[in-house]
């Protein structure tokens, strides 16, 4: 006979452990336990039955796997936390004795990050454990980038120290430099929350959110201690990723950083990239102002030129001794033309012909020179323009260092990005000097010849469509086209604002819209006729008043009686039509086109009714399970169709208002 199992020794009671028990087992404080769980990727678990795990468990009790807590017992960071706890006790005892000097000495020896910048511990081994391969780290980079870009834009407080913000900003700028060098950026989208970016790195799509450069207001209901724990982990992760990405393209990491330029607002221009590919590949050279900072050594260059000249002289002598090249038969001259694959026999396979790629999306802005006005978002525009090949970007000196030029009148500028309304400076014709201060200059409307002026959305739409959009649609003060998300794939039958309304509306919608337009036109015509009748009646009344002194009371009573009789007759016709099911016969004959549209609408309704009846009969042949599934699918499709119908109706109304 087997032994009886004791209660709480197996099953769910042994597989789960409460948070209080875990903290006691690890001999940690609750904040340190939270840090350790965040860094190691251990999350609370919900058991199937709380009563079986613990009878004293309440709704707020947090459970963990016992194996996860057992795994934390071997973590090297535990000893670091315990040493820190012992040190804090020593400092508190020294302060209790009144020995301030001893407490200060202990604090200096602790090498705290907020005092000396030296970390008490590192998370390198945690990164290696959680991400065995580099692809695993790239897949978890979305939240990392979003969090670090958020903290890079926060103001410094007691909960968010300035050193943490500076470290986040530097890591983010290093990552942006890699995207610029490797042309890995693919799409971007302007939203209410911020700017979304999508990059493709080693086959992995990475999507992150960057907030706008506004003054952030830090509220008190956000726990920045927990967020700071995530940021500390993500900073280590992005440092590893940046090192791997830089070395993969032959760049030195970390890149050279100019603190003086960064203090002057250079941001991307404060970094100078160095590496193997910088000297040979023009696409990956260090760009701060559009050109490399370090040139070749003049002595070495002179020796190289001398050797090249000697080789040229020797090759010319050999060519003169051998004779002219025209005497050689069958010599083929080199050509840049692409070979054509032609079928040898008639009826052979037709092979696809090779062709030069006329447009490279990664070099979309490579031939253009931009100037950014002061009201435009300089940081995001500079990054996205450089990521797509632009090397010459200028802006006003008040926006910071690192520009290609600060002269707005530079003739090499091809595009200027503006985001201000067109100012109409109205001059006073009478010559009064009241508004002379506001209208004495036309600087905001000044335009340089040979330059295109566009709004910032032109850059994002061109990047998402992989082609330069027409600048006429994005001119200053123009009503911009809809800015659609490039991350949403259009589905068949769904509303698409880029397609004309006539191509995506149903037949019934088109007929209803035409009938509505016809009714509106008929109503306008009747209003005009009524106005004309009223005007003619008023003229006749005026003439009668001129001829006669007044109108008799009997004539007024006769007119009112006629109106009452006509109204009663009209009501009688409506009641008879309602009883018989026929339409009310109007005074005017119906237009032939309107009548044809009404007939088409009735035929369409009959067709829909017959299709619905056929569908109901087909549903009766299904099983109960399949019928429920089919009805659920119908409900979802009808809901989407109703939403699309509302959008099309709204668009139709807006188009009518524009035409009016």
Swiss-Prot record:
Residues 501-659 form a coiled coil. Signal peptide: none annotated. Disulfide bonds: none annotated. Residues 313-358, 471-660 are annotated as: Disordered. Keywords: Coiled coil, Nucleus, Ribosome biogenesis, rRNA processing. GO terms for biological process: maturation of 5.8S rRNA from tricistronic rRNA transcript (SSU-rRNA, 5.8S rRNA, LSU-rRNA); maturation of LSU-rRNA from tricistronic rRNA transcript (SSU-rRNA, 5.8S rRNA, LSU-rRNA). Transmembrane segments: none annotated. Residues 504-566 have a biased composition (Acidic residues). One of its GO terms (molecular function) is ribonucleoprotein complex binding. GO terms for cellular component: nucleoplasm; PeBoW complex; preribosome, large subunit precursor. It is found in: Nucleus, Nucleolus; Nucleus, Nucleoplasm. PROSITE patterns: BRCT. It comes from the Eukaryota. Residues 331-342, 584-619 have a biased composition (Basic and acidic residues). Its main location: nucleus. Residues 360-476 form the BRCT domain. Component of the NOP7 complex, which is required for maturation of the 25S and 5.8S ribosomal RNAs and formation of the 60S ribosome. Component of the NOP7 complex, composed of ERB1, NOP7 and YTM1. The complex is held together by ERB1, which interacts with NOP7 via its N-terminal domain and with YTM1 via a high-affinity interaction between the seven-bladed beta-propeller domains of the 2 proteins. The NOP7 complex associates with the 66S pre-ribosome. Belongs to the pescadillo family. This is Pescadillo homolog. The lineage of its organism: Eukaryota, Fungi, Dikarya, Ascomycota, Pezizomycotina.
């Amino acid at each position: 006979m087997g032994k009886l199992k004791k209660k709480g020794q197996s099953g769910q009671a042994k597989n789960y452990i409460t948070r209080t028990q875990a903290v006691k087992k690890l001999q940690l404080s609750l904040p340190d336990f939270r840090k350790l769980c965040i860094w190691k990727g251990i999350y609370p678990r919900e058991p199937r039955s709380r009563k079986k795990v613990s009878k004293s468990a309440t709704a707020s009790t947090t459970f963990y796997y016992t194996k996860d807590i057992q795994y934390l017992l071997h973590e090297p960071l535990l000893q670091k936390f315990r040493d820190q706890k012992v040190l804090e006790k020593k400092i508190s005892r020294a302060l209790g004795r009144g020995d301030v000097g001893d407490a200060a000495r202990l604090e200096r020896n602790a090498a705290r990050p907020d005092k000396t910048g030296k970390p008490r511990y590192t998370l390198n081994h945690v990164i290696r454990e959680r991400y065995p391969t580099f692809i695993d780290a790239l897949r978890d980079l979305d939240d990392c980038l979003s969090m670090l870009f958020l903290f890079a834009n926060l103001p410094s407080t007691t909960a968010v120290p300035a050193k943490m913000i500076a470290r986040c900003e530097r890591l983010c700028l290093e990552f942006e430099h890699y995207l610029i060098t490797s042309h890995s950026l693919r799409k971007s989208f302007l939203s209410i929350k911020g700017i979304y970016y999508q990059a493709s790195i080693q086959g992995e799509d990475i999507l992150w959110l960057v907030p706008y450069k506004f003054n952030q207001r830090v509220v008190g209901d956000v726990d920045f201690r927990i967020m700071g724990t995530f940021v500390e982990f993500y900073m280590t992760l992005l440092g590893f990723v940046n090192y791997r990405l830089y070395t993969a393209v032959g760049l030195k990491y970390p890149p050279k950083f100019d603190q003086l330029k960064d203090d002057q607002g250079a941001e991307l221009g404060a970094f100078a990239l160095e590496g193997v590919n910088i000297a040979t590949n023009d696409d990956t050279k260090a760009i701060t102002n559009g050109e490399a900072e370090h040139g070749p050594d003049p002595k070495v260059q002179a020796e190289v030129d001398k050797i090249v000249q000697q080789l040229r002289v020797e090759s010319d002598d050999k060519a003169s001794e051998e004779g002219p090249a025209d005497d050689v038969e069958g010599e083929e001259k080199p050509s840049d033309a692409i070979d054509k694959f032609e079928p040898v026999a008639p009826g052979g396979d037709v092979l696809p012909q090779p062709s030069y790629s006329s447009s490279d999306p990664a070099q979309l802005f490579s031939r253009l020179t931009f100037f950014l006005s002061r009201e435009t978002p300089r940081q995001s525009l500079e990054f996205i323009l450089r990521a797509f090949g632009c090397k010459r970007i200028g802006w006003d000196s008040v926006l910071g260092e690192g520009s290609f030029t600060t002269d707005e009148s530079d003739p090499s500028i091809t595009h200027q990005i503006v985001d201000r309304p067109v100012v109409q400076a109205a001059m006073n014709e009478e010559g009064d000097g009241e508004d002379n201060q506001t209208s004495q200059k036309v600087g905001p409307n000044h335009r340089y010849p040979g330059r295109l002026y566009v709004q910032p959305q032109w850059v994002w739409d061109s990047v998402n469509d992989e082609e330069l959009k027409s600048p006429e649609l994005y001119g200053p003060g123009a009503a911009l086209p809809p800015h659609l998300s490039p991350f949403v794939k259009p589905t068949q039958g769904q509303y698409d604002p880029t397609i004309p309304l006539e191509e995506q509306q149903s037949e019934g919608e088109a007929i209803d819209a035409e009938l509505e337009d016809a009714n509106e036109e008929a109503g306008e015509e009747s209003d005009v006729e009524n106005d004309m009748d009223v005007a003619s009646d008023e003229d006749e009344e005026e003439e009668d008043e001129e001829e006669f002194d007044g109108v008799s009371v009997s004539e007024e009573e006769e007119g009112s009686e006629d109106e009452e009789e006509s109204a009663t007759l009209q009501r009688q016709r409506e009641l008879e039509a309602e009883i018989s099911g026929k339409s009310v016969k109007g005074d005017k004959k119906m237009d032939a086109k309107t009548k044809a549209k009404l007939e088409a609408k009735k035929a369409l309704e009959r067709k829909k009714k017959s299709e619905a009846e056929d569908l109901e009969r087909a549903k009766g042949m299904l099983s109960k399970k399949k019928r429920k599934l089919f009805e659920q699918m119908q409900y979802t499709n009808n809901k989407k169709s109703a939403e699309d119908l509302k959008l099309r109706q709204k668009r139709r109304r807006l188009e009518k208002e524009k035409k009016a």
